[in-house]
Amino acid sequence: MAARLCCQLDPARDVLCLRPVGAESRGRPLPGPLGALPPASPPAVPSDHGAHLSLRGLPVCAFSSAGPCALRFTSARRMETTVNAHRNLPKVLHKRTLGLSAMSTTDLEAHFKDCVFTEWEELGEEIRLKVFVLGGCRHKLVCSPAPCNFFTSA
């Protein structure tokens, strides 16, 4: 069974943030400039939280009480097929970073929940979950596959 994560879009910096459900800091905005590491604080979850879970592609900061660093992620399979062709996620996110009109925050959150969490939690395809770190996260990935370029998904 996969861990439950809270998925929130930070429109100010146009990044998707993950937080373990139940962490005291859930929903709190990430501090500092993009790429800054969260400040050290007493853990709201045990230090070994997640050690028993099958979480491939999530950086270790995903279990921090301060929440993970800014992340963008998607399902590799969805990127490789025409299922999301009408959304064309990389171009949508790139347009948002340029300040151009694109998918609404609500639509983007729904896309991630539908394409990622349904497959991950219900179908057990967590090995296909990819994490794309575009904002300077300095943490190592847990059981990470080979690095994958966001705009040319492998």
UniProtKB/Swiss-Prot annotation:
The keyword Transcription regulation applies. Multifunctional protein that plays a role in silencing host antiviral defenses and promoting viral transcription. Does not seem to be essential for HBV infection. May be directly involved in development of cirrhosis and liver cancer (hepatocellular carcinoma). Most of cytosolic activities involve modulation of cytosolic calcium. The effect on apoptosis is controversial depending on the cell types in which the studies have been conducted. May induce apoptosis by localizing in mitochondria and causing loss of mitochondrial membrane potential. The lineage of its organism: Viruses, Riboviria, Pararnavirae, Artverviricota, Revtraviricetes. InterPro entries: Transactivation_prot_X. Keywords: Activation of host NF-kappa-B by virus, Activator, Apoptosis, Host cytoplasm, Host G2/M cell cycle arrest by virus, Host mitochondrion, Host nucleus, Host-virus interaction, Modulation of host cell cycle by virus, Transcription, Transcription regulation. May form homodimer. May interact with host CEBPA, CFLAR, CREB1, DDB1, E4F1, HBXIP, HSPD1/HSP60, NFKBIA, POLR2E and SMAD4. Interacts with host SMC5-SMC6 complex and induces its degradation. Interacts with host TRPC4AP; leading to prevent ubiquitination of TRPC4AP. Interacts with host PLSCR1; this interaction promotes ubiquitination and degradation of HBx and impairs HBx-mediated cell proliferation. It comes from Hepatitis B virus genotype B2 (isolate Indonesia/pIDW420/1988). Belongs to the orthohepadnavirus protein X family. This is Protein X. It is found in: Host cytoplasm; Host nucleus; Host mitochondrion. GO terms for cellular component: host cell mitochondrion; host cell nucleus. One of its GO terms (biological process) is viral genome replication. Its main location: host cell.
